[in-house]
Amino acid sequence: MTYIFDLDKLNQTAKDCRENYSNAAPYPHVVIDNFLTEESARQVLENFPGSKDGIHWDQYGYEGYEIKIATSREEQFPALIKNALHDLNSGPFIRFLQELTGIEHLFADPHMLGGGLHLVGRDGLLGIHADFNWHPELQAHRRINLMIYFNDNWLPEYDGDLELWSTDAKTCVKSIEPVFNRAVIFSTTSDSFHGHPRPLKLPEGQWRRSIAMYYYTTQRPENELQNPHNTRYKGLHLE
């Protein structure tokens, strides 16, 4: 079976990057370029739905905290996009994530709560935040975030870098350009603060495109346990 990724390459990447992942600051993460095969990444870009393609997009317009559109309604997706998402929820891919992160017993979210396809346009942003930690339908702990970017000819002056912040939400520790076929994987906790907080300076009609997928376990380490909470924004839920 052909996947959108090169499985042998991914498995080697997991072995090579596992130590760097667990030791990364401000929290465990890795940035992987050329994540999907070149052909698959190009096909995803070509088939990535636009804002007016007849798909239901959820609108997020909370000024200063989140301005974007997103959808997880896979029944409306082009077949190629739907198949790509299924590959990212497949057994071989989850085994890669387990090897990379050291987190066992991961499973995918078929509902893609909060995930799926994301589009952010001119003046859009995503404030610095820590994600919700509990999936009420799966009754499971959120453990891993995966973002893959599909932004050809991206320029630094667009101001769309993903920022990873310190666990006290005081300082930006790392900035990551959302360039084409780059993946960012990180461990999700109640203090894994991140976002792209500056309004995008994109040309009118251009978008910051990404696929976001999240992975879960039924248990998590005791030192990470907190009561279930929704997304926590710096400046709204904490200073």
PLM-predicted stretches and their roles:
Residues 29, 129, 194-196:
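Histidine-centered active-site/metal-ligand motif
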Residues 145-147:
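Eukaryotic charged/polar low-complexity linker/IDR segments
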Residues 10, 37, 41, 81, ...:
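A structural signal for well-ordered alpha-helical scaffolds and beta->alpha junctions
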Residues 1-25, 230-239:
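Fe(II)/2-oxoglutarate
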Residues 46-51, 76, 80, 85-142:
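Non-heme Fe(II) oxygenase catalytic core, chiefly the N-lobe of the double-stranded beta-helix
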Residues 5, 9, 18-101:
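Non-heme Fe(II)/2-oxoglutarate
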Residues 31, 107-110, 116, 185-186, ...:
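A structural signal for short, well-ordered beta-strand segments and their strand-loop junctions
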Residues 133-142, 151-239:
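Catalytic core of Fe(II)/2-oxoglutarate
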